[in-house]
């Protein structure tokens, strides 16, 4: 029901979630995957995890503060398999000293993988943080290097 509404009324996806408290839920994951954007999203994720897709074409709408959106737009410019530091990302948005704020903004990215915050690492070469868990960030970086 919700998947149909989102697919028909909007040209973007910002989040797929179940909000049981508000009585908004998908009946099954199959409902999401087989309809509209969900089908295309599944295809693109399958391709990504097979190293056959290097960027996503799913329309998205970034929802956040102007600073967060600026950070997330910068993330979308980082090429598949490439990493940059939080400091480099801060420099790319015009404020080299804001690397901690950049890291904080990246941590609030709700569209990880599509908006690839996993490609940003600490200035010293360490992996840095990742809201989904460090092991997921490591997996994604290794996947993009072809090392699964």
Regions found by a protein language model. Name each.
Residues 1-15:
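Short alpha-helical DNA-recognition segment
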Residues 17, 106:
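DNA major-groove recognition helix of helix-turn-helix
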Residues 123-148:
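…primarily DNA-binding HTH/wHTH and HhH modules…
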Residues 34, 44-97, 143, 147-148:
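Basic nucleic-acid-binding alpha-helical/helix-turn surface characteristic of O6-alkylguanine DNA
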Residues 9-12, 25, 98:
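Short coil turns linking two alpha-helices in DNA-binding domains
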């Amino acid at each position: 029901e919700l998947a149909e509404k989102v697919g028909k009324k909007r040209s973007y996806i910002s989040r797929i979630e179940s909000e049981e408290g508000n009585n908004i839920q998908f009946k099954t994951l199959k409902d999401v995957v087989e309809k509209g954007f969900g089908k295309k999203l599944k295809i693109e994720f399958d391709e990504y995890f097979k190293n056959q897709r290097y960027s996503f074409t799913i329309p998205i709408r970034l929802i956040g503060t102007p600073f967060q959106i600026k950070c997330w737009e910068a993330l979308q410019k980082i090429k598949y398999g490439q990493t940059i530091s939080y400091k480099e990302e801060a420099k790319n948005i015009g404020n080299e000293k804001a690397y901690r704020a950049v890291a904080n903004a990246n941590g609030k990215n709700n569209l990880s993988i599509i908006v690839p915050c996993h490609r940003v690492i600490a200035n010293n070469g360490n992996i840095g943080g990742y809201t989904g868990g460090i092991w997921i960030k490591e997996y994604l970086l290794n996947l993009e290097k072809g090392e699964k």
